[in-house]
């Protein structure tokens, strides 16, 4: 697991213009209540640079995203003080004696069994979008889709597509 709001035990509040291109494209066609699995190729994620030390160069990323709510810019400004007070720091990778970093134990032992699992969606369930992202909706919500200027409240888990290693999750943060 390299990223998951589930492991934090809380949703994450994001501004769509601040996320990677693949996330933005996936979110723009979601309605509140939708749960979407999305596979994002490297050119729409962190490209050849990666996001060291957690995400290697040219990594395809898999996310499960639950769109909880959409805030307009005015609503986001009205709640900005509350959001800032509730911000939780991103976990820092553990340094090794050799000067590198432990990316993850990759046994996902701290990832809750009740949270979405990497194996929950199979290859044949995905549909490829024109941008190159692949999506599968496990639940379809209703309501207004966000636009790129909205702030969204989401639950999510991010896996390295190559091995299912969780790199972040809202489910593991308290």
Task: Indicate where each model-derived feature is located.
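Cross-family detector of peptidyl-prolyl cis-trans isomerase
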Residues: 1-174
């Amino acid at each position: 697991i390299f990223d998951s709001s589930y492991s934090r035990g809380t949703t994450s509040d994001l501004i769509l213009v601040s996320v990677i291109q693949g996330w933005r494209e996936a979110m723009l066609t979601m309605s509140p209540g939708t749960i979407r699995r999305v596979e994002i190729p490297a050119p729409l994620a962190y490209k050849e640079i990666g996001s060291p030390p957690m995400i290697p160069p040219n990594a395809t990323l898999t996310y499960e995203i639950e769109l909880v709510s959409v805030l307009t810019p005015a609503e986001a400004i009205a709640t900005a003080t509350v959001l800032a007070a509730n911000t939780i720091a991103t976990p820092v990778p553990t340094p090794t004696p050799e000067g590198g970093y432990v990316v993850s134990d990759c046994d996902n032992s701290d990832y809750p069994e009740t949270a979405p699992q990497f194996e929950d969606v199979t290859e044949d369930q995905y549909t490829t979008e024109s941008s190159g992202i692949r999506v599968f909706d496990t639940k379809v919500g209703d309501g207004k889709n966000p636009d790129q200027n909205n702030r969204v409240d989401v639950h999510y888990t991010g896996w390295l597509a190559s091995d299912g290693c969780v790199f972040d999750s809202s489910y593991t943060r308290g």
